[in-house]
A protein has these predicted regions:
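Catalytic-core regions built around general acid/base machinery
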Residues: 92-95, 115-127
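Structural motif
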Residues: 4-5, 98-102, 130-131, 171-173
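C-terminal and late-domain segments of enzyme folds
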Residues: 1-38, 48, 54-58, 145, ...
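Catalytic nucleophile loop
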Residues: 101-102, 124-142
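Portal/gating segments that form or line small-molecule/metal binding sites
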Residues: 45-108
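Short glycine-rich anion-binding loops that position phosphate/pyrophosphate groups of nucleotides
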Residues: 104-106, 135, 177
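Glycine/threonine-rich flexible loop motifs
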Residues: 106-115, 182
Length: 245
């Protein structure tokens, strides 16, 4: 498979934007998608973060189907995978040339992915996978589920490390340019991340940066920060490409 791990494919989701999101052309994102896209329209499957947010999942598919059409990345349809059709995942996934791992609450999505049996199902998948925010986080073998909802940072029972899909060993923290100075439960998000990096390392990405995984190699496109051992370092600049493995 070809795996794109994005913070967001269409700019910062927390800032005002057009009704139909425009796919980000920074760091060759759209160009790299087009380079691997088949020369015909493919079925798209958007695997939800919240399996019961039916209206939200339908609307997300509607707007992103148009986004991909506007970027000349043709889909026959973009259908949501949530609680309504979860039992069909075994047949839906092999039919889909494109899979979107949607954004949302990381632990909620992680639980849904496990219910679907996705880690095993992806072993034989050879299409294009696009992770978006939480979806990119849950693609990792061991996920860094950074606290994001009020109460999570202060909860000693909140699990910050989860078993993910195993599509990559790279853990990401998305929307970093937006969240780094936020305060959660009295702690700055950046300070929470630095403390957590003493246990396991991860990459913080701003919107517009992404990791491309293909043919056994991975590369960071755009700016990123490496967190490890309680420290962080900016390791790449916009429009630069850094091989990771």
């Amino acid at each position: 498979m070809t795996l794109f791990l994005t913070s967001s494919p269409s700019g910062c989701p927390f800032e005002p934007g057009p009704d139909i999101p425009v796919l980000d052309t920074r760091n060759h994102f759209v160009a790299n998608l087009r380079a691997v896209w088949p020369d015909h329209a493919v079925l798209g499957l958007a695997i939800a973060a919240d399996p019961y947010a039916y209206e939200q999942n339908d609307e997300m598919c509607r707007v992103f189907a148009q986004s991909f059409a506007n970027a000349h990345l043709p889909l026959t349809a973009l259908i949501p995978c949530d609680a309504r059709n979860a039992e069909e995942i075994g047949s839906l996934l092999p039919q889909s040339g494109f899979v979107m791992l949607c954004g949302g609450h990381v632990p909620t999505q992680n639980h849904f992915f496990a219910q679907l049996g996705l880690p095993g199902l992806f072993h034989n998948y050879h299409g294009i996978v696009l992770g978006v925010s939480a979806g990119s986080m849950n693609a990792a073998h061991i996920v860094y589920a950074a606290p994001e909802e009020p109460g999570e940072a202060a909860d000693p029972h909140y699990s910050r490390w989860l078993n993910g899909l195993g599509l990559t060993e790279t853990r990401i923290l998305p929307h970093y340019q937006f969240i780094r100075d936020h305060v959660l439960d009295g702690q700055k998000v950046e300070d929470i991340a630095l403390a957590d990096s003493k246990k396991r390392h991860f990459l913080a990405l701003p919107d517009g940066s992404y990791i491309l995984c293909a043919d056994g190699s991975e590369a960071l496109y755009g700016k990123g920060w490496y967190f490890a051992d309680g420290m962080m370092e900016e390791i790449n600049e916009d429009e630069d490409v850094l091989p990771l493995r």
